[in-house]
Design a protein with these regions (language model features):
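Nucleotide/phosphate-binding catalytic cleft detector across ATP-hydrolyzing
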Residues: 1-65, 73-191, 197-226
Length: 228
């Protein structure tokens, strides 16, 4: 009877998770009441959620940027051919915004404000435009509330530094990928999922540096959940 009541659970994990970490995740799920635990690597779930047919012998490149990590993988025949996971996700972009405002203006802002700034004017594109956002925080000198107008152009360098590291990791994965699959990827391009993939200009940066087209998947923020 207990077996019938306990659910089977599928959990997504970063592609670079270690055996020790995997066991810890499984044990935690079992202690929480799971009967059976299945671990799915995030790029696989993201690809399925993005409606990519990974069952065929052709190669597909997926970039999934979550809150804490960016997972890159080349997928083919229902498996991962090459992969890399780096600890650079949406949270790192937010932290970069916080650090810039603190160092440049002595303005302290919270995580929610940083994310709002990133979503409203954050870009790594070649032409950031003239957009401006009013940032509200606390002046570190006076301790009083303060508002400052920040432009997309001045914010771009701190975001670009992180984005370039992600693109470099993608290049590393491609360099280790068999030539025939690289040819497929040149045709199909890269599919981007996760909340971090919504950063404006990231697709342009990938296209410029890697010479392949890049496209944000439909419902990018939900792809991993859908694919699970």
């Amino acid at each position: 009877q207990n077996a019938l009541l306990k659910p089977r659970v599928a959990l997504c994990v970063p592609s670079a998770i270690t055996d020790v970490e995997s066991r810890a995740v499984v044990e935690a799920a079992v202690k929480a009441g799971a009967r059976k635990v299945y671990l799915i690597e995030e790029p696989v779930a993201a690809a399925i959620g993005a409606k990519i047919d990974i069952s065929k012998p052709s190669g597909h490149l997926v970039l999934d940027i979550g809150g804490g990590t960016a997972d890159i993988a080349v997928l083919s025949l229902n498996g991962i051919v090459q992969k890399e996971s780096i600890k650079l996700g949406g949270d790192k972009f937010d932290q970069a915004v916080v650090r810039y405002l603190r160092e440049r203006y002595g303005l302290l802002i919270g995580e929610k404000m940083a994310e709002m700034v990133k979503r409203e004017i954050g870009t790594v594109g070649r032409e950031p435009g003239n957009e401006v956002f009013d940032v509200k925080g606390r002046n570190l000198t006076t301790g009083l509330p303060e508002k400052r107008s920040i432009s997309a152009a001045e914010l771009r360098p701190c975001l670009l530094e992180i984005a370039q590291q992600i693109v470099s990791a993608m290049q590393s994965v491609l360099e280790r990928t068999p030539p025939e699959l690289v040819g497929d990827i040149f045709t199909s391009g890269a599919v981007m999922t996760g909340g971090g993939s919504l950063l404006r200009g990231l697709d342009e940066l990938i296209e410029e540096k890697l010479h392949i087209k890049a496209e944000v998947a439909e419902s990018a923020e939900e792809c991993v959940a859908i694919g699970t």
